Amino acid sequence: MRIAILSQGPQLYSTKRLVEAALARGHEVKVINPLKCYMNINMTKPSIHMAGKDLGHFDAVIPRIGASVTFYGSAVLRQFEMMGVYAVNGSIGIARSRDKLRSMQLLSRQGIGLPITGFANKPSDIPDLIDMVGGAPLVVKLLEGTQGIGVVLAETRKAAESVLEAFMGLKANIMVQEYIAEAQGADIRCFVLGDKVIAAMKRQAKPGEFRSNLHRGGSATLVKLTPEERSVALRAAKTMGLNIAGVDLLRSNHGPVVMEVNSSPGLEGIEKATQKDVADAIICFMEKNANKSIKSAQ
Protein backbone atom coordinates (compact mmCIF):
# COMPACT_ATOMS: atom_id res chain seq x y z
CA MET A 1 0.00 0.00 0.00
CA ARG A 2 1.01 3.62 -0.56
CA ILE A 3 0.56 5.54 2.69
CA ALA A 4 0.68 9.28 3.35
CA ILE A 5 1.43 10.59 6.84
CA LEU A 6 0.33 14.21 7.25
CA SER A 7 2.87 15.73 9.62
CA GLN A 8 4.95 18.89 9.91
CA GLY A 9 7.57 16.99 11.90
CA PRO A 10 9.23 14.03 10.13
CA GLN A 11 11.74 13.83 13.03
CA LEU A 12 9.07 13.63 15.75
CA TYR A 13 8.98 10.33 17.65
CA SER A 14 5.40 9.49 16.64
CA THR A 15 5.97 10.19 12.95
CA LYS A 16 9.22 8.21 12.85
CA ARG A 17 7.63 5.23 14.60
CA LEU A 18 4.72 5.16 12.15
CA VAL A 19 7.14 5.30 9.21
CA GLU A 20 9.21 2.46 10.72
CA ALA A 21 6.12 0.32 11.32
CA ALA A 22 4.77 0.91 7.81
CA LEU A 23 8.11 0.10 6.15
CA ALA A 24 8.50 -3.02 8.31
CA ARG A 25 5.18 -4.27 6.95
CA GLY A 26 6.23 -3.69 3.35
CA HIS A 27 4.41 -0.47 2.58
CA GLU A 28 5.55 2.61 0.70
CA VAL A 29 5.24 5.64 2.97
CA LYS A 30 5.62 9.37 2.45
CA VAL A 31 5.60 12.07 5.16
CA ILE A 32 3.80 15.13 3.81
CA ASN A 33 3.75 18.57 5.41
CA PRO A 34 0.12 19.68 4.94
CA LEU A 35 1.14 23.37 4.91
CA LYS A 36 3.24 22.73 1.79
CA CYS A 37 0.29 21.20 -0.06
CA TYR A 38 -2.15 23.02 -2.32
CA MET A 39 -5.29 21.65 -3.89
CA ASN A 40 -7.12 21.51 -7.18
CA ILE A 41 -10.81 21.20 -6.31
CA ASN A 42 -12.88 20.25 -9.35
CA MET A 43 -15.72 17.93 -10.32
CA THR A 44 -13.74 15.48 -12.46
CA LYS A 45 -10.30 14.87 -10.97
CA PRO A 46 -9.55 16.57 -7.64
CA SER A 47 -5.86 16.50 -6.77
CA ILE A 48 -3.23 17.55 -4.23
CA HIS A 49 0.01 19.21 -5.28
CA MET A 50 3.32 20.10 -3.67
CA ALA A 51 6.29 21.99 -5.17
CA GLY A 52 4.73 22.00 -8.63
CA LYS A 53 3.94 18.27 -8.74
CA ASP A 54 0.78 16.21 -8.33
CA LEU A 55 1.26 13.95 -5.29
CA GLY A 56 -0.51 11.15 -7.12
CA HIS A 57 -2.50 8.25 -5.68
CA PHE A 58 -2.40 7.03 -2.08
CA ASP A 59 -4.29 4.11 -0.56
CA ALA A 60 -4.42 5.50 2.98
CA VAL A 61 -3.61 8.62 4.95
CA ILE A 62 -2.65 8.93 8.62
CA PRO A 63 -3.24 12.49 9.86
CA ARG A 64 -0.84 13.84 12.49
CA ILE A 65 -2.05 17.42 12.21
CA GLY A 66 -0.84 19.88 14.84
CA ALA A 67 -3.45 21.94 16.69
CA SER A 68 -2.04 25.20 15.31
CA VAL A 69 -2.73 24.12 11.71
CA THR A 70 -6.10 22.41 12.24
CA PHE A 71 -7.96 24.51 9.66
CA TYR A 72 -5.56 24.07 6.74
CA GLY A 73 -4.55 20.54 7.73
CA SER A 74 -8.20 19.45 7.85
CA ALA A 75 -8.78 20.98 4.41
CA VAL A 76 -5.91 18.91 2.98
CA LEU A 77 -7.25 15.79 4.71
CA ARG A 78 -10.74 16.45 3.27
CA GLN A 79 -9.16 16.63 -0.18
CA PHE A 80 -7.63 13.17 0.35
CA GLU A 81 -11.07 11.93 1.45
CA MET A 82 -12.69 13.46 -1.66
CA MET A 83 -10.15 11.53 -3.75
CA GLY A 84 -11.28 8.25 -2.18
CA VAL A 85 -8.24 7.78 0.08
CA TYR A 86 -8.93 5.91 3.34
CA ALA A 87 -8.28 8.21 6.32
CA VAL A 88 -7.50 6.47 9.62
CA ASN A 89 -9.05 9.48 11.36
CA GLY A 90 -11.52 11.54 9.34
CA SER A 91 -11.61 15.32 9.04
CA ILE A 92 -14.98 15.61 10.82
CA GLY A 93 -13.78 13.71 13.90
CA ILE A 94 -10.61 15.80 14.08
CA ALA A 95 -12.59 19.06 13.83
CA ARG A 96 -14.96 17.94 16.59
CA SER A 97 -12.19 16.96 18.98
CA ARG A 98 -10.15 20.13 18.39
CA ASP A 99 -13.07 22.31 19.48
CA LYS A 100 -12.94 21.80 23.27
CA LEU A 101 -16.37 23.32 23.88
CA ARG A 102 -18.08 21.40 21.10
CA SER A 103 -16.53 18.13 22.26
CA MET A 104 -17.81 18.74 25.82
CA GLN A 105 -21.30 19.41 24.43
CA LEU A 106 -21.23 16.24 22.30
CA LEU A 107 -20.04 14.10 25.22
CA SER A 108 -22.67 15.65 27.49
CA ARG A 109 -25.40 14.77 25.00
CA GLN A 110 -24.29 11.13 25.10
CA GLY A 111 -24.41 11.04 28.91
CA ILE A 112 -20.64 10.56 29.24
CA GLY A 113 -19.09 11.67 32.55
CA LEU A 114 -17.58 15.17 32.48
CA PRO A 115 -16.38 17.79 34.92
CA ILE A 116 -19.08 20.45 35.36
CA THR A 117 -18.25 22.98 32.65
CA GLY A 118 -19.33 26.60 32.23
CA PHE A 119 -19.06 28.97 29.28
CA ALA A 120 -19.95 32.66 29.16
CA ASN A 121 -19.29 35.80 27.16
CA LYS A 122 -19.88 38.74 29.53
CA PRO A 123 -17.86 39.74 32.62
CA SER A 124 -21.16 40.37 34.43
CA ASP A 125 -21.82 36.60 34.27
CA ILE A 126 -18.58 35.70 36.09
CA PRO A 127 -20.07 35.37 39.63
CA ASP A 128 -22.78 32.99 38.40
CA LEU A 129 -20.28 31.08 36.26
CA ILE A 130 -18.07 30.46 39.30
CA ASP A 131 -21.06 29.28 41.36
CA MET A 132 -22.18 27.04 38.49
CA VAL A 133 -19.03 24.89 38.70
CA GLY A 134 -19.09 24.68 42.49
CA GLY A 135 -16.93 27.68 43.33
CA ALA A 136 -13.16 27.83 43.81
CA PRO A 137 -10.84 26.11 43.35
CA LEU A 138 -11.69 25.83 39.67
CA VAL A 139 -9.92 25.41 36.34
CA VAL A 140 -9.92 28.00 33.55
CA LYS A 141 -9.04 26.73 30.05
CA LEU A 142 -8.29 28.54 26.83
CA LEU A 143 -10.26 26.78 24.11
CA GLU A 144 -7.26 27.00 21.76
CA GLY A 145 -4.69 25.69 24.27
CA THR A 146 -2.76 22.41 23.95
CA GLN A 147 -0.32 20.37 26.05
CA GLY A 148 -1.44 22.13 29.24
CA ILE A 149 -0.74 25.62 27.86
CA GLY A 150 -3.55 28.05 28.65
CA VAL A 151 -4.83 26.04 31.65
CA VAL A 152 -5.01 27.90 34.96
CA LEU A 153 -5.94 26.65 38.43
CA ALA A 154 -7.68 29.46 40.33
CA GLU A 155 -7.48 28.46 43.99
CA THR A 156 -9.68 31.25 45.42
CA ARG A 157 -12.82 33.02 44.26
CA LYS A 158 -10.93 36.31 43.98
CA ALA A 159 -8.23 34.69 41.83
CA ALA A 160 -10.92 33.10 39.63
CA GLU A 161 -12.63 36.45 39.12
CA SER A 162 -9.33 38.14 38.23
CA VAL A 163 -8.27 35.44 35.76
CA LEU A 164 -11.68 35.34 34.06
CA GLU A 165 -11.86 39.13 33.80
CA ALA A 166 -8.36 39.23 32.30
CA PHE A 167 -9.10 36.55 29.69
CA MET A 168 -12.45 38.12 28.78
CA GLY A 169 -10.76 41.52 28.49
CA LEU A 170 -8.40 39.98 25.93
CA LYS A 171 -11.41 38.55 24.03
CA ALA A 172 -10.05 35.04 24.60
CA ASN A 173 -12.42 32.08 24.31
CA ILE A 174 -12.38 30.27 27.65
CA MET A 175 -14.32 27.67 29.57
CA VAL A 176 -14.47 27.07 33.31
CA GLN A 177 -14.46 23.60 34.89
CA GLU A 178 -14.82 22.19 38.36
CA TYR A 179 -11.53 21.13 39.94
CA ILE A 180 -11.41 17.38 40.63
CA ALA A 181 -9.28 17.50 43.79
CA GLU A 182 -9.51 13.77 44.45
CA ALA A 183 -7.56 13.04 41.23
CA GLN A 184 -4.50 14.42 43.06
CA GLY A 185 -2.80 15.73 39.94
CA ALA A 186 -3.09 12.45 38.03
CA ASP A 187 -4.99 11.55 34.90
CA ILE A 188 -5.28 8.44 32.74
CA ARG A 189 -4.52 8.42 29.02
CA CYS A 190 -6.48 5.68 27.24
CA PHE A 191 -5.22 4.90 23.75
CA VAL A 192 -8.24 3.88 21.67
CA LEU A 193 -7.82 2.09 18.35
CA GLY A 194 -11.06 1.11 16.64
CA ASP A 195 -13.29 -0.64 19.15
CA LYS A 196 -10.53 -1.40 21.68
CA VAL A 197 -8.44 0.39 24.28
CA ILE A 198 -5.05 -1.04 23.31
CA ALA A 199 -2.95 0.73 25.96
CA ALA A 200 -3.35 2.96 29.00
CA MET A 201 -1.03 4.94 31.24
CA LYS A 202 -1.35 7.02 34.38
CA ARG A 203 0.22 10.47 34.15
CA GLN A 204 1.21 12.13 37.42
CA ALA A 205 1.94 15.84 37.66
CA LYS A 206 5.29 16.86 39.10
CA PRO A 207 5.26 18.25 42.67
CA GLY A 208 3.63 21.68 42.88
CA GLU A 209 1.95 21.27 39.48
CA PHE A 210 -1.66 20.24 38.77
CA ARG A 211 -1.28 19.62 35.02
CA SER A 212 -0.20 16.04 34.34
CA ASN A 213 0.85 16.53 30.69
CA LEU A 214 4.19 14.89 29.92
CA HIS A 215 5.17 18.12 28.14
CA ARG A 216 4.78 19.85 31.54
CA GLY A 217 7.18 17.46 33.28
CA GLY A 218 4.65 14.82 34.36
CA SER A 219 5.63 11.15 34.68
CA ALA A 220 3.91 8.13 33.12
CA THR A 221 3.35 4.61 34.44
CA LEU A 222 1.35 1.57 33.37
CA VAL A 223 -2.19 1.50 34.78
CA LYS A 224 -4.97 -1.09 34.92
CA LEU A 225 -8.32 0.26 33.75
CA THR A 226 -11.66 -0.58 35.31
CA PRO A 227 -14.39 -1.87 32.97
CA GLU A 228 -16.21 1.46 33.40
CA GLU A 229 -13.12 3.47 32.43
CA ARG A 230 -12.61 1.30 29.35
CA SER A 231 -16.26 1.76 28.36
CA VAL A 232 -16.16 5.54 28.87
CA ALA A 233 -13.00 5.87 26.74
CA LEU A 234 -14.52 3.86 23.88
CA ARG A 235 -17.79 5.81 24.01
CA ALA A 236 -15.92 9.13 24.03
CA ALA A 237 -13.86 8.21 20.94
CA LYS A 238 -16.97 6.95 19.14
CA THR A 239 -18.86 10.15 19.98
CA MET A 240 -16.10 12.19 18.33
CA GLY A 241 -16.07 9.85 15.32
CA LEU A 242 -12.41 8.90 15.82
CA ASN A 243 -10.74 5.54 15.13
CA ILE A 244 -7.55 6.65 16.90
CA ALA A 245 -7.91 8.71 20.06
CA GLY A 246 -6.12 9.55 23.26
CA VAL A 247 -8.93 9.85 25.80
CA ASP A 248 -7.88 11.60 29.00
CA LEU A 249 -9.82 10.60 32.12
CA LEU A 250 -9.79 11.68 35.75
CA ARG A 251 -10.84 9.35 38.55
CA SER A 252 -13.46 11.35 40.45
CA ASN A 253 -15.69 10.49 43.41
CA HIS A 254 -18.56 10.01 40.96
CA GLY A 255 -16.70 7.82 38.48
CA PRO A 256 -14.45 8.50 35.48
CA VAL A 257 -14.79 11.93 33.85
CA VAL A 258 -13.46 12.81 30.40
CA MET A 259 -11.17 15.83 30.25
CA GLU A 260 -10.24 15.68 26.59
CA VAL A 261 -10.34 13.51 23.48
CA ASN A 262 -7.12 13.92 21.48
CA SER A 263 -7.27 13.04 17.77
CA SER A 264 -3.48 12.97 17.35
CA PRO A 265 -2.20 11.28 20.52
CA GLY A 266 1.55 11.03 20.94
CA LEU A 267 3.14 7.57 20.84
CA GLU A 268 6.31 8.12 22.85
CA GLY A 269 4.81 8.29 26.34
CA ILE A 270 2.34 5.45 25.84
CA GLU A 271 4.85 3.09 24.15
CA LYS A 272 7.52 3.66 26.80
CA ALA A 273 5.09 3.36 29.73
CA THR A 274 3.34 0.22 28.44
CA GLN A 275 6.09 -1.42 26.30
CA LYS A 276 3.46 -1.92 23.58
CA ASP A 277 4.11 -1.46 19.88
CA VAL A 278 1.31 1.02 19.30
CA ALA A 279 2.69 2.15 15.92
CA ASP A 280 2.50 -1.40 14.52
CA ALA A 281 -1.06 -1.76 15.86
CA ILE A 282 -2.06 1.43 14.01
CA ILE A 283 -0.58 0.18 10.72
CA CYS A 284 -2.32 -3.20 11.13
CA PHE A 285 -5.63 -1.44 11.81
CA MET A 286 -5.10 0.76 8.76
CA GLU A 287 -4.34 -2.24 6.51
CA LYS A 288 -7.48 -4.05 7.58
CA ASN A 289 -9.79 -1.07 7.18
CA ALA A 290 -8.23 0.44 4.05
CA ASN A 291 -8.61 -2.92 2.31
CA LYS A 292 -12.28 -3.01 3.34
CA SER A 293 -12.70 0.50 1.95
CA ILE A 294 -11.07 -0.45 -1.37
CA LYS A 295 -13.26 -3.57 -1.73
CA SER A 296 -16.48 -1.66 -0.99
CA ALA A 297 -15.54 0.95 -3.62
CA GLN A 298 -15.01 -1.69 -6.33
Curated annotation (Swiss-Prot):
It comes from Shewanella frigidimarina (strain NCIMB 400). This is Probable alpha-L-glutamate ligase 2. Binds 2 magnesium or manganese ions per subunit. GO terms for molecular function: ATP binding; metal ion binding; ribosomal S6-glutamic acid ligase activity. The lineage of its organism: Bacteria, Pseudomonadati, Pseudomonadota, Gammaproteobacteria, Alteromonadales. Keywords: ATP-binding, Ligase, Magnesium, Manganese, Metal-binding, Nucleotide-binding, Protein biosynthesis. Belongs to the RimK family. It comes from the Bacteria. It is an enzyme of class 6 (ligase). GO terms for cellular component: cytoplasm. One of its GO terms (biological process) is protein modification process. Mg(2+) 1 binds at D248, E260. Transmembrane segments: none annotated. The keyword Transmembrane does not apply. Residues 104-287 form the ATP-grasp domain. The gene is rimK2.
